[in-house]
From Swiss-Prot:
<keyword id="KW-0813">Transport</keyword>
<dbReference type="GO" id="GO:0051539">
    <property type="term" value="F:4 iron, 4 sulfur cluster binding"/>
</dbReference>
<keyword id="KW-0472">Membrane</keyword>
<keyword id="KW-0004">4Fe-4S</keyword>
<feature type="transmembrane region" description="Helical; Name=III">
    <location>
        <begin position="183"/>
        <end position="207"/>
    </location>
</feature>
<feature type="transmembrane region" description="Helical; Name=X">
    <location>
        <begin position="652"/>
        <end position="674"/>
    </location>
</feature>
<keyword id="KW-0602">Photosynthesis</keyword>
<comment type="function">
    <text>PsaA and PsaB bind P700, the primary electron donor of photosystem I (PSI), as well as the electron acceptors A0, A1 and FX. PSI is a plastocyanin-ferredoxin oxidoreductase, converting photonic excitation into a charge separation, which transfers an electron from the donor P700 chlorophyll pair to the spectroscopically characterized acceptors A0, A1, FX, FA and FB in turn. Oxidized P700 is reduced on the lumenal side of the thylakoid membrane by plastocyanin.</text>
</comment>
<keyword id="KW-0603">Photosystem I</keyword>
<keyword id="KW-0249">Electron transport</keyword>
<keyword id="KW-0411">Iron-sulfur</keyword>
<dbReference type="InterPro" id="IPR020586">
    <property type="entry name" value="PSI_PsaA/B_CS"/>
</dbReference>
<dbReference type="Pfam" id="PF00223">
    <property type="entry name" value="PsaA_PsaB"/>
</dbReference>
<keyword id="KW-0148">Chlorophyll</keyword>
<keyword id="KW-0793">Thylakoid</keyword>
<keyword id="KW-0812">Transmembrane</keyword>
<feature type="binding site">
    <location>
        <position position="561"/>
    </location>
    <ligand>
        <name>[4Fe-4S] cluster</name>
    </ligand>
</feature>
């Protein structure tokens, strides 16, 4: 299944800029060359039309990507080992903040090193690494060093693998298209054995070490990981059933293991994180599911599922040929494959964002509010990018890989044939959502300005309670006992029902109340998401042709206009739809992050007195303030931004500078988005004239950015 030595390793070849393209390799005539070089370097489709060669390049590039990821991880662990207060934080996580970066005293920058507690001065980090390290049982900086070195070794291995599997032993196309085998290995190997080994690590290393840490034992006194693995008596002291070894497993007396494989639900009141015994149980269960799933598909033996059969059998009474032909699409178009994967992974990433705060998985994560906010923001943004990427690659598939002559009356063909109905209805839904959701706010602003609070939509006047959401919350809060035997509490405290959990005088989590304010902003979310989908879906469904430009497929994925003499055909390419979709994705996620930040500070996060009185960070003002646009501007945007803007001269000044810098970058983007190409070309011509006059003109002709290039630079900034 492999070819030996298919491509020779040549440093001379790599050193030649643009070696992958005949035109670019000729060298620059104009400055457009450098843009084309960057645009096409990784567009393997443009290098060759041979699917096997493209597949090999993608496969090899994945190893390069993994190498970079290991390098990054190594850097994170190295910072933890070399520059951090991890051991101090471990001994007192409620009073000491995590820091892994100390700024050198150059031109006064050491002002950034704030006091994070315990006499350590540095920048407080919000990545959540300390919490993960504690959960995985890392007790010393030496262990972090070892892990960092291990990650570097793996980075080197991955780099080697990328070279080896392209230049020395490159898989044949048949190997890339053997989906059943791939599914079996990925499910059973990566997900199954991966989860099983993690569950094993948690049971044998994380659980005992965290038991000791929770009990207040000094990290230096705790036995090292290998001692727990080699010495069963150590574990048996904490979990007596360990003394029996594997006997209960083989005699099916599994309840013996209930000490360390639990099903409690809720949070550990000591750390404010999920019970680590629940997490270990979860990974064991997941491992078993995936190990079974990894044996479902038919390979060398004549048993199991065949993907092609499953897809072709999948048709309903109203859907024509159903999924017939989908198998061929997904095994010959990597763009189509990638599109599906991005859509699913993007959605999953957003689900992760919501679980990180509602079911905080690591010890002391819930009371580290900055980290909670950062993790939510990070996962929302990544999810948004992946979903827009899904639309981008779906459109590239439509333009480059879709063959309309062989597709008839399957689901994709049927969707394309009634795309006008889909898009016009979706457009109507967007208009409806936009006017109504915004209209509710405008109504409230107007009534507020007229001094008529009794006529506003609010929890104290005209109520618009999110009754369905409240019903879902209530159902989950009542679920333990009714549905899940043995579970003492519901999956998340946010559903309601339980008492709040406080750790070190700070609220970890409490039932999150939903009211009129949430109902209003929820419909803004619905509006922005639907508009994003409208733009992206229109780009995909009209990527090959439209009434305006019937031959769009011939123009490619990105083009500025349909040539001279065709007015009104600019910015219609599939690429332009991705460009516009990105802006709406930014829009949508901004509102989500605003909602989350304010809601959590107002109704969840805060301190708790000895008498049990909770004081929230913004004093519970979300319900009454966020129901007007003015409230959002005054009590959220200005109230929070003013603290950042006034941070100059304090250890927080970096955030003020970032805030300022981010707005500069944003303003800079407008220069590219509102620019006329001809204006710049004209300006360049006169600058070139001046250079010629002084006989210092370069051989490479300067060119203004093309329309598409300008928009690319703009949207990036």
């Amino acid at each position: 299944l492999v070819d030996r030595d298919p491509v020779k390793t040549s440093f001379e070849e790599w050193a030649r800029p643009g070696h992958f393209s005949r035109t670019i390799a000729k060298g620059p005539e104009t400055t457009t060359w450098i843009w084309n070089l960057h645009a096409d370097a990784h567009d393997f489709d443009s290098h060759t039309s041979d699917l096997e060669e493209i597949s090999r390049k993608v496969f090899s590039a994945h190893f390069g990507q993994l190498s970079i990821i290991f390098l990054w991880l190594s850097g994170m662990y190295f910072h933890g080992a070399r520059f951090s207060n991890y051991e101090a934080w471990l001994s007192d996580p409620t009073h000491i903040g995590p820091s892994a970066q100390v700024v050198w005293p150059i031109v006064g920058q050491e002002i950034l090193n704030g006091d994070v507690g315990g006499g350590f001065r540095g920048i407080q980090i919000t990545s959540g690494f300390f919490q993960i390290w504690r959960a995985s049982g890392i007790t010393s900086e030496l262990q972090l060093y070892c892990t960092a070195i291990g990650a570097l070794v793996f980075a080197g291995l991955m780099l080697f693998a990328g070279w080896f599997h392209y230049h020395k032993a490159a898989p044949k196309l048949a190997w890339f298209q053997d989906v059943e085998s791939m599914l079996n290995h990925h499910l059973a190997g990566l997900l199954g054995l991966g989860s099983l080994s993690w569950a094993g690590h948690q049971v044998h290393v994380s659980l005992p070490i965290n038991q000791f840490l929770d009990a207040g034992v000094d990290p230096k006194e705790i036995p090292l990981p290998h001692e727990f693995i080699l010495n069963r008596d150590l574990l048996a002291q904490l979990y007596p059933s360990f003394a029996e070894g594997a006997t209960p497993f083989f005699t099916l007396n599994w309840s013996k293991y209930a000490e360390f494989l639990t099903f409690r639900g809720g949070l550990d009141p000591v750390t404010g994180g999920l019970w680590l015994t629940d997490i270990a149980h979860h990974h064991l269960a997941i491992a078993i599911l995936f190990l079974i799933a990894g044996h479902m598909y038919r390979t060398n033996w004549g048993i199991g599922h065949g993907l092609k059969d499953i897809l072709e059998a999948h048709k309903g009474p109203f859907t024509g040929q159903g999924h017939k032909g989908l198998y061929e699409i997904l095994t010959t178009s990597w763009h189509a494959q990638l599109s599906l994967n991005l859509a699913m992974l993007g959605s999953l990433t957003i689900v992760v964002a919501h679980h990180m705060y509602s079911m905080p998985p690591y010890p002391y994560l819930a009371i580290d509010y900055g980290t909670q906010l950062s993790l939510f923001t990070h996962h929302m943004w990544i999810g948004g990018f992946l979903i827009v990427g899904a639309a981008a690659h779906a459109a590239i598939f439509m333009v480059r890989d879709y063959d309309p002559t062989t597709r008839y009356n399957d689901l994709l063909d049927r969707v394309l044939r009634h795309r006008d109905a889909i898009i016009s209805h979706l457009n109507w839904a967007c208009i409806f959502l936009g006017f109504h959701s915004f209209g509710l706010y405008i109504h409230n602003d107007t009534m507020s300005a007229l001094g008529r609070p009794q006529d506003m939509f609010s929890d104290t006047a005209i109520q618009l309670q999110p009754i369905f959401a409240q019903w879902v919350q209530n159902t989950h809060a009542l679920a333990p006992g009714a549905t899940a035997p043995g579970a003492t509490t519901s999956t998340s405290l946010t559903w309601g029902g339980g008492d709040l959990i406080a750790v070190g005088g700070k609220v970890a989590l409490l039932p999150i109340p939903l009211g009129t304010a949430d109902f209003l902003v929820h419909h803004i979310h619905a509006f922005t998401i639907h508009v994003t989908v409208l733009i992206l879906l229109k780009g995909v469904l009209f990527a090959r042709s439209s009434r305006l430009i019937p031959d769009k497929a011939n123009l490619g994925f990105r083009f500025p206009c349909d040539g001279p003499g065709r007015g009104g055909t600019c910015q219609v390419s599939a690429w332009d739809h991705v460009f516009l979709g990105l802006f709406w994705m930014y829009n949508a996620i901004s509102v989500v992050i605003f909602h989350f930040s304010w809601k959590m500070q107002s109704d969840v996060w805060g301190s708790i007195s000895d008498q049990g009185v909770v004081t929230h960070i913004t004093g519970g003002n979300f319900a009454q303030s966020s129901i007007t646009i003015n409230g959002w501007l005054r009590d959220f945007l200005w109230a929070q931004a003013s603290q950042v803007i006034q941070s100059y001269g304090s250890s927080l000044s970096a955030y003020g500078l970032f805030f300022l810098g981010a707005h500069f970058v944003w303003a800079f983007s407008l220069m590219f988005l509102f620019s006329g190409r001809g204006y710049w070309q004209e300006l360049i011509e006169s600058i070139v004239w001046a250079h010629n006059k002084l006989k210092v003109a370069p051989a490479t002709q300067p060119r203004a950015l093309s329309i598409v290039q300008g928009r690319a630079v703009g949207v990036t900034h």
